[in-house]
Amino acid sequence: SITPGPNNLMLMASGANFGFRRTLPHMLGVALGFTLMLVLVGIGLVGLFETYPASYEVLKVVSVAYLLYLAWKIATSASHPGSGESKPEGTPMTFLQAVLFQWVNPKGWTMALTALSVYAPSQNLLAVLFVAAVFGAINFPCVSSWTLLGQRLQSLLTSDRRLVAFNVTMATLLVVSLYPVLLP
């Protein structure tokens, strides 16, 4: 939950572009969405991948495509051209968008499948709920720290050029985070 990945990089970019308060729905969507995903995967959705192995490959393709789209949106969310102010265009991700994003987040899937296979291998409901509760309790403070880091960077992003450079850097890091997904 604290390590760099698509959620945290997007939250840092959102914190830098929109501030902590406007990013709050995005943070809550990540925390609650991932917890919900853990529960649903833990109680049986993982069986889909076992029954239909091609569904995992489809998920990978959709995930990569969506993350590339989000990276493009971040990279091109520049400030108002020619205004001299570093006020970003666009809006932060909504609660629902962040909840839904968890289902195409490759790092989220990796974390969920690993945690559930190690700590709830028998798909026992109590074990699944315990794993989800632990992640739920840890997740929000972790994602908040990335948003706060982004907000702290606002004082450095005072010109159009700096904001554009920051957004392009965050988008590039988001694309680089796909490297493990693309490995055979």
Where are these regions (language model features)?
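Selective transmembrane alpha-helices of multi-pass membrane proteins
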Residues: E50-S79, N139-W146, L156-P184
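Alpha-helical membrane-protein architecture signal
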Residues: P88, P92-L100, L126-F130
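Flexible cytoplasmic inter-helical loops of multi-pass small-molecule transporters
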Residues: T76-M93
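Juxtamembrane transmembrane-helix termini in multi-pass membrane transport proteins
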Residues: S1-E57, A112-F135, T147
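Residue-level signature of transmembrane alpha-helical cores of multipass secondary-active transporters
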Residues: V30, A98-Q102, F135-N139
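Hydrophobic alpha-helical transmembrane segments in multi-pass integral membrane proteins
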Residues: L40-G42, W103-L113, T172-P184
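Hydrophobic/aromatic residues within the transmembrane alpha-helices of Major Facilitator Superfamily
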Residues: I2, L36, W72, W103-P106, ...
